[in-house]
Amino acid sequence: MTAIETGAGSSHADRMDRMYRTQRHVYDLTRKYYLFGRDTLINELNVPAGGSVLEVGCGTGRNLALISQRFPDARLFGLDISAEMLASAEAKLGKPRLTRTVLRVADATDFQASEFGETGFDRIVISYALSMIPDWEKAVGAAIAALNPGGSLHIADFGQQERLPRLFRRGLQAWLRRFHVTPRKTMAAVLKSNADRFGDTLEFRPIGRGYAWLFTYRRAAR
């Protein structure tokens, strides 16, 4: 059955709960207009039969529901620091055909696969979450550490809008700051540094003239 477990508490968690206490009810409806690349990321997961998928910062469960439809044999897991958002995820994922989902209130910067009863995950998804996590580099490290050998980390997030007009870029980033969102300039460099360190590989693809960035980080088979 779908289950929610608790295990996180911080000022960041409190801030996210306050922000999403009411927003969570309209989150999916509004975000589809500017969180681009999420469906592309899901379609490219190529989850092995019976494989495990963790979404870090799973929010309302929108992506996990689509992953279940696209890969019906996958075992699904989700974590989020906001208990408010996970309440929406539980409602969305608590349907009979989505009962293989385990949800946990947890900090993206400090989690382990063993907390979910797993030794590692075949796929990890982080969709538009790193731009909201203060210690986002630590979250990247935790996700990489939680991958199975041969597994992959899939990231979609705001880019630097590097090929879009400067006025648009400045306006968008000012608007995003109102919601505690900061596009990470060094995300590609941080991921590449980790890949070089561990002998892994990284694929980087900007979309929408740099509006968003997609990454696929592949762990080497050990």
Feature locations, PLM:
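Conserved class I S-adenosyl-L-methionine
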Residues: T2-N46, R62-L66, F168-A174
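C-terminal alpha-helical "lid/dimerization" subdomain adjacent to the S-adenosyl-L-methionine
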Residues: T30, H154-W213
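Short glycine-dipeptide loop
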Residues: G50, L147-S152
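Class I SAM-dependent methyltransferase SAM/SAH-binding core
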Residues: L54, T60-F111
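A short acidic, Gly/Pro-enriched loop at the edge of an enzyme's catalytic core
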Residues: T109, A113-I124
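A short SAM/SAH-binding and catalytic strip from SAM-dependent methyltransferases
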Residues: D122-D135
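A short glycine-rich, Lys/Arg-flanked "PGG" loop and its adjoining helix->strand segment in the class I
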Residues: E137-P149
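C-terminal lobe and adjacent flexible extensions of AdoMet/dcAdoMet transferase-like proteins
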Residues: F215-R222
